[in-house]
Amino acid sequence: MALSFSLLMAVLVLSYKSICSLGCDLPQTHSLGNRRALILLAQMGRISPFSCLKDRHDFGFPQEEFDGNQFQKAQAISVLHEMIQQTFNLFSTKDSSATWEQSLLEKFSTELNQQLNDLEACVIQEVGVEETPLMNVDSILAVKKYFQRITLYLTEKKYSPCAWEVVRAEIMRSFSLSKIFQERLRRKE
Protein backbone atom coordinates (compact mmCIF):
# COMPACT_ATOMS: atom_id res chain seq x y z
CA MET A 1 0.00 0.00 0.00
CA ALA A 2 1.38 3.43 -0.95
CA LEU A 3 2.01 6.07 1.65
CA SER A 4 -1.27 7.62 2.63
CA PHE A 5 -2.00 11.13 1.47
CA SER A 6 -2.46 12.35 5.03
CA LEU A 7 0.96 11.01 6.05
CA LEU A 8 2.60 12.78 3.12
CA MET A 9 0.76 16.00 3.95
CA ALA A 10 1.88 15.77 7.59
CA VAL A 11 5.48 15.32 6.48
CA LEU A 12 5.21 18.30 4.14
CA VAL A 13 3.68 20.54 6.82
CA LEU A 14 6.28 19.54 9.39
CA SER A 15 9.05 20.07 6.85
CA TYR A 16 7.80 23.53 5.92
CA LYS A 17 9.08 25.09 9.15
CA SER A 18 12.56 23.72 8.63
CA ILE A 19 12.58 24.84 4.99
CA CYS A 20 11.83 28.43 5.91
CA SER A 21 14.74 28.61 8.35
CA LEU A 22 17.15 26.30 6.51
CA GLY A 23 20.50 27.69 5.53
CA CYS A 24 21.95 26.05 2.48
CA ASP A 25 24.85 23.91 3.52
CA LEU A 26 24.29 21.37 0.76
CA PRO A 27 27.16 19.02 1.38
CA GLN A 28 26.45 18.84 5.11
CA THR A 29 22.65 18.48 5.11
CA HIS A 30 22.38 16.39 1.99
CA SER A 31 25.29 14.15 2.90
CA LEU A 32 23.62 13.32 6.21
CA GLY A 33 20.30 12.57 4.50
CA ASN A 34 22.07 10.55 1.84
CA ARG A 35 23.75 8.45 4.54
CA ARG A 36 20.41 7.82 6.29
CA ALA A 37 18.81 6.86 2.96
CA LEU A 38 21.64 4.42 2.24
CA ILE A 39 21.24 2.81 5.67
CA LEU A 40 17.49 2.42 5.12
CA LEU A 41 18.05 0.95 1.64
CA ALA A 42 20.50 -1.55 3.12
CA GLN A 43 17.94 -2.53 5.77
CA MET A 44 15.27 -3.01 3.09
CA GLY A 45 17.14 -5.93 1.52
CA ARG A 46 15.00 -9.03 1.94
CA ILE A 47 16.71 -11.59 -0.23
CA SER A 48 20.32 -12.44 -0.81
CA PRO A 49 21.81 -10.49 -3.70
CA PHE A 50 23.69 -13.68 -4.64
CA SER A 51 20.40 -15.41 -5.44
CA CYS A 52 19.71 -12.68 -8.03
CA LEU A 53 22.99 -12.68 -9.94
CA LYS A 54 21.26 -13.87 -13.12
CA ASP A 55 19.04 -10.76 -12.99
CA ARG A 56 21.88 -8.23 -12.85
CA HIS A 57 21.57 -5.41 -15.33
CA ASP A 58 23.58 -2.35 -16.37
CA PHE A 59 21.18 0.58 -16.22
CA GLY A 60 23.75 3.00 -17.58
CA PHE A 61 24.10 5.36 -14.62
CA PRO A 62 24.86 8.79 -16.13
CA GLN A 63 28.27 9.02 -14.44
CA GLU A 64 29.47 11.73 -16.80
CA GLU A 65 26.71 14.02 -15.52
CA PHE A 66 28.23 13.74 -12.06
CA ASP A 67 31.88 13.94 -13.13
CA GLY A 68 31.97 17.34 -14.76
CA ASN A 69 33.14 20.51 -13.08
CA GLN A 70 31.00 22.68 -15.35
CA PHE A 71 28.16 22.93 -12.84
CA GLN A 72 27.19 25.97 -10.89
CA LYS A 73 26.10 24.99 -7.40
CA ALA A 74 22.41 25.60 -8.22
CA GLN A 75 22.68 23.40 -11.33
CA ALA A 76 24.35 20.61 -9.35
CA ILE A 77 21.59 20.82 -6.76
CA SER A 78 19.01 20.53 -9.55
CA VAL A 79 20.63 17.32 -10.85
CA LEU A 80 20.72 15.84 -7.33
CA HIS A 81 17.10 16.90 -6.82
CA GLU A 82 16.04 15.11 -10.00
CA MET A 83 17.81 11.93 -8.95
CA ILE A 84 16.11 11.93 -5.55
CA GLN A 85 12.73 12.85 -7.06
CA GLN A 86 12.94 9.94 -9.49
CA THR A 87 13.97 7.60 -6.65
CA PHE A 88 11.02 8.82 -4.58
CA ASN A 89 8.66 8.22 -7.53
CA LEU A 90 10.07 4.72 -8.08
CA PHE A 91 9.63 3.66 -4.47
CA SER A 92 6.17 5.26 -4.19
CA THR A 93 4.49 2.88 -6.62
CA LYS A 94 2.02 0.20 -5.59
CA ASP A 95 4.43 -2.42 -6.95
CA SER A 96 7.13 -1.10 -4.64
CA SER A 97 4.78 -1.12 -1.65
CA ALA A 98 4.03 -4.79 -2.24
CA THR A 99 7.74 -5.64 -2.20
CA TRP A 100 9.25 -3.87 0.80
CA GLU A 101 8.58 -3.94 4.53
CA GLN A 102 6.10 -1.09 5.02
CA SER A 103 7.69 0.75 7.95
CA LEU A 104 11.13 0.82 6.27
CA LEU A 105 9.57 1.99 3.01
CA GLU A 106 7.76 4.81 4.83
CA LYS A 107 10.96 5.89 6.61
CA PHE A 108 12.85 5.80 3.31
CA SER A 109 10.15 7.84 1.55
CA THR A 110 10.10 10.36 4.39
CA GLU A 111 13.90 10.70 4.21
CA LEU A 112 13.77 11.25 0.45
CA ASN A 113 11.00 13.82 0.88
CA GLN A 114 13.09 15.71 3.45
CA GLN A 115 16.07 15.70 1.09
CA LEU A 116 13.88 17.07 -1.70
CA ASN A 117 12.68 19.88 0.56
CA ASP A 118 16.24 20.69 1.65
CA LEU A 119 17.47 20.77 -1.95
CA GLU A 120 14.58 23.02 -3.03
CA ALA A 121 15.46 25.43 -0.21
CA CYS A 122 19.09 25.38 -1.37
CA VAL A 123 18.14 26.20 -4.95
CA ILE A 124 16.06 29.14 -3.73
CA GLN A 125 18.93 30.39 -1.58
CA GLU A 126 21.51 29.95 -4.34
CA VAL A 127 19.44 31.76 -6.95
CA GLY A 128 18.07 34.33 -4.53
CA VAL A 129 14.52 34.11 -5.87
CA GLU A 130 11.84 31.49 -5.76
CA GLU A 131 12.41 30.35 -9.31
CA THR A 132 14.40 27.37 -10.46
CA PRO A 133 17.73 28.31 -12.02
CA LEU A 134 18.71 27.73 -15.58
CA MET A 135 19.87 24.17 -15.37
CA ASN A 136 21.80 21.75 -17.43
CA VAL A 137 18.83 20.27 -19.29
CA ASP A 138 20.92 17.49 -20.80
CA SER A 139 21.97 16.32 -17.32
CA ILE A 140 18.40 16.31 -16.04
CA LEU A 141 17.32 14.40 -19.15
CA ALA A 142 20.12 11.85 -18.63
CA VAL A 143 18.91 11.21 -15.07
CA LYS A 144 15.30 10.82 -16.27
CA LYS A 145 16.35 8.35 -18.98
CA TYR A 146 18.34 6.37 -16.42
CA PHE A 147 15.22 5.97 -14.29
CA GLN A 148 13.13 5.12 -17.36
CA ARG A 149 15.53 2.23 -18.02
CA ILE A 150 15.09 1.07 -14.42
CA THR A 151 11.30 1.24 -14.70
CA LEU A 152 11.36 -0.63 -18.03
CA TYR A 153 13.55 -3.33 -16.45
CA LEU A 154 11.12 -3.76 -13.55
CA THR A 155 8.21 -4.00 -15.99
CA GLU A 156 10.00 -6.58 -18.14
CA LYS A 157 10.83 -8.62 -15.03
CA LYS A 158 7.22 -8.28 -13.83
CA TYR A 159 8.37 -6.56 -10.63
CA SER A 160 9.87 -9.81 -9.33
CA PRO A 161 11.61 -9.84 -5.94
CA CYS A 162 14.97 -10.32 -7.65
CA ALA A 163 14.31 -7.42 -10.02
CA TRP A 164 13.56 -5.17 -7.05
CA GLU A 165 16.71 -6.42 -5.30
CA VAL A 166 18.79 -5.51 -8.36
CA VAL A 167 17.14 -2.07 -8.44
CA ARG A 168 17.69 -1.56 -4.71
CA ALA A 169 21.40 -2.32 -5.17
CA GLU A 170 21.56 0.04 -8.16
CA ILE A 171 19.95 2.88 -6.22
CA MET A 172 22.42 2.30 -3.38
CA ARG A 173 25.22 2.55 -5.93
CA SER A 174 23.82 5.77 -7.42
CA PHE A 175 23.45 7.33 -3.96
CA SER A 176 27.04 6.40 -3.18
CA LEU A 177 28.22 8.01 -6.42
CA SER A 178 26.19 11.14 -5.70
CA LYS A 179 27.96 11.37 -2.34
CA ILE A 180 31.29 11.60 -4.18
CA PHE A 181 29.76 14.32 -6.37
CA GLN A 182 28.71 16.25 -3.24
CA GLU A 183 32.20 15.98 -1.78
CA ARG A 184 33.55 17.52 -4.98
CA LEU A 185 31.07 20.37 -4.58
CA ARG A 186 32.23 20.91 -1.01
CA ARG A 187 35.86 21.21 -2.17
CA LYS A 188 34.83 23.78 -4.81
CA GLU A 189 33.26 26.07 -2.19
UniProtKB/Swiss-Prot annotation:
It comes from the Eukaryota. GO terms for molecular function: cytokine activity; cytokine receptor binding; type I interferon receptor binding. One of its GO terms (cellular component) is extracellular space. Its main location: secreted. It is found in: Secreted. Residues 1-23 form the signal peptide. Keywords: Antiviral defense, Cytokine, Disulfide bond, Secreted, Signal. The keyword Nucleus does not apply. The keyword Signal applies. Pfam families: Interferon. One of its GO terms (biological process) is B cell activation involved in immune response. SUPFAM superfamilies: 4-helical cytokines (SSF47266). Disulfide bonds join C24-C122, C52-C162. SMART domains: IFabd. Produced by macrophages, IFN-alpha have antiviral activities. Interferon stimulates the production of two enzymes: a protein kinase and an oligoadenylate synthetase. Belongs to the alpha/beta interferon family. This is Interferon alpha-21.
